Amino acid sequence: MNDTVTIRTRKFMTNRLLQRKQMVVDVLHPGKATVPKTEIREKLAKMYKTTPDVVFVFGFRTQFGGGKTTGFAMVYDSLDYAKKNEPKHRLATHGLYEKKKTSRKQRTERQNRMKKVRSIKKASVGAAGKKN
């Protein structure tokens, strides 16, 4: 980790309902490339005395000319709360969720079955396709 990289948090909020701390993160990195998210996660985990697996960072934008990047971070109280509240795509980037992918042929057959019916019956046709 670079010593010249500074991480500041602002708009800090403790969200008791979702068991997390949420904040806007400013990363100051003058004369350097954008800092990797993994590095930011590790530094935030050290700041809030927790492990990096419960820290979720996203939405980073580097200002024109570089030197400053702003994003959003959430630090959960435990991994269970994180799995419950975080969107699936964000869990997937952490390696905590894997989507069950059906074969292309099954998806196409299901799509074609759904084309043959109209309105709310599509749901029952789609569900029947999942059972097989």
Swiss-Prot record:
Keywords tagged on the record: Cytoplasm, Ribonucleoprotein, Ribosomal protein
UniProt xrefs under SUPFAM superfamilies: Ribosomal proteins S24e, L23 and L15e (SSF54189)
UniProt feature coiled coil, ranges: none
Stated role: Component of the small ribosomal subunit. The ribosome is a large ribonucleoprotein complex responsible for the synthesis of proteins in the cell. Required for processing of pre-rRNA and maturation of 40S ribosomal subunits.
Keyword Magnesium: no
Chain intervals for the UniProt region annotation (Disordered): 91-132
Main location: cytoplasm
Known partners and oligomeric status: Component of the small ribosomal subunit.
Stretches with biased composition (Basic and acidic residues): 96-112
Disulphide-bonded residues: none
GO biological process annotation, one example: translation
Protein name per Swiss-Prot or TrEMBL: Small ribosomal subunit protein eS24
GO molecular function: structural constituent of ribosome
Membrane spanning residue stretches: none
Superkingdom as given in the UniProt entry: Eukaryota
Compartments where found: Cytoplasm
Family according to the record: Belongs to the eukaryotic ribosomal protein eS24 family.
Species in which this protein is naturally found: Oryzias latipes (Japanese rice fish)
GO terms under cellular component: cytoplasm; ribosomal subunit
Tagged with keyword Ribosomal protein: yes
